Amino acid sequence: MASSLCVSNSTICPLPNVSSQPLLSFSHSLRPFISKSKPMCASIQKRDGSQFVVKSQALDFSGTFFEGGFGSDDDPTSPSGSGVSTALEDKPEPQCPPGLRQYETMAVLRPDMSEDERLGLTQKYEELLVAGGGMYVEVFNRGVIPLAYSIRKKNKAGETNTYLDGIYLLFTYFTKPESIVPLETVLTADDDIIRSSSFKIKKRKYN
């Protein structure tokens, strides 16, 4: 039985002249992250008649490390800086004073707090950090963000509330290591704070 099979481009069985092209073509472009910051400044009247200026900055963190909810409490040390540090890496950092360490504290506030309540709480913890030896205190407001999971918390009145989102505040500062435990104790007991966690910042090492 005779059979014919065309297996090569010959004069007997010429193959069509087709240019060699890849079957699939992929293209991917990376878009650099751009931080959209909105600086804010508010002045609050203190009991003694003087004024206290609260500096804060609202940042857009979509697509960064902090996107999608609050991180785990199991890791007490921030791995080589957080997403906020990355977003602000172009900003010159102050030199760490002798005997102090650089820390970040992320606090998630009740989502129903008013702007005045939030500014008052911000002032309270700025003053607490300074009283504990803190320096170069800055606060960054992320706004209301959905939580990665629901959080139940009982307040001092015995009421239990379940939260699905919260106002994220990030405090960056230099302080003595021994002042972190008292700070976390106050944060945990605060009815206005759903969750909080403090991290010591590790500087990146370049070869």
Curated annotation (Swiss-Prot):
A Gene Ontology molecular function term of the record: rRNA binding
InterPro entries per the UniProt record, alphabetical: Ribosomal_bS6, Ribosomal_bS6_sf, Ribosomal_S6_plastid/chlpt, Transl_elong_EF1B/ribsomal_bS6
Pfam families in the record: Ribosomal_S6
Keyword Chloroplast: yes
A GO CC term attached to the entry: ribosome
Low complexity: compositionally biased ranges: 77-86
Annotated coiled-coil segments of the chain: none
GO biological process: translation
Keyword annotations: Chloroplast, Plastid, Ribonucleoprotein, Ribosomal protein, RNA-binding, rRNA-binding, Transit peptide
Annotated region described as Disordered, given as residue ranges: 69-99
Cysteine disulfide partners in this protein: none
Range of the transit peptide: 1-59
Major location (coarse): plastid
Family: Belongs to the bacterial ribosomal protein bS6 family.
Quaternary structure note: Part of the 30S ribosomal subunit.
Record's function text: Binds together with bS18 to 16S ribosomal RNA.
Name of the molecule in the record: Small ribosomal subunit protein bS6c
Species per Swiss-Prot/TrEMBL record: Arabidopsis thaliana
Gene of this entry: RPS6
